[in-house]
């Protein structure tokens, strides 16, 4: 594990990064909660127990030993964005939902759900990659775009849904 500190607008955020099969992923902790997952995070700084646990869970997920993350998280954004994140968290490993199915759950349009998925600050852990278009993969705002979405779905055993 590697550790880093990111300073943004005079607010210090602890970052721990871990190498994975899809690249280096960095977890951001603020005030005892995970607030972001960053792609290709930089290393340096202090270590916290929460970040150590988060990196351990990410490693276990990619080793096929973890189906569901158990970390305190705080999602910035509107009540609607948080509702979409909650709906994504309810999608089990190896399964997918469409933007329309999530829209029915949260009482919004599929396009609004897609926009909220694109603003997901904690991808992989909040599994926006499990949300697909009705007739296509939809998008993915993480590093690598839709190709990364496919890699994550294959890792989870949901690749058969892509054919």
Where are the regions that the model predicts?
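Structural signal for hydrophobic
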Residues: 88, 128-129, 152
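Residue-level detection of the helix-turn-helix DNA-binding "recognition helix"
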Residues: 118
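Short Lys/Arg-enriched helix C-cap and helix-to-coil transition segments
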Residues: 125-133
């Amino acid at each position: 594990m590697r550790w880093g500190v990111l300073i943004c607008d005079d607010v210090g955020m602890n970052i721990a990064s871990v190498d994975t099969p899809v690249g280096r992923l960095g977890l951001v902790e603020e005030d005892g909660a995970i607030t972001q997952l960053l792609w290709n995070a930089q290393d340096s700084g202090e270590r916290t127990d929460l970040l150590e646990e988060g990196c351990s869970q990410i490693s276990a997920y990619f080793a096929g030993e973890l189906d569901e993350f158990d970390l305190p998280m705080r999602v910035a954004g509107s009540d609607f964005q948080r509702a979409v994140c909650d709906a994504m968290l309810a999608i089990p490993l190896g399964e997918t939902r469409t933007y329309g199915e999530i829209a029915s759950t949260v009482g919004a349009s599929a396009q609004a759900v897609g926009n909220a998925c694109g603003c997901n600050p904690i991808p992989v852990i909040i599994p926006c990659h499990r949300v697909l278009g009705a007739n296509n993969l939809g998008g993915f705002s993480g590093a690598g775009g839709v190709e990364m979405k496919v890699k994550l779905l294959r890792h989870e055993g949901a690749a058969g849904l892509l054919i």
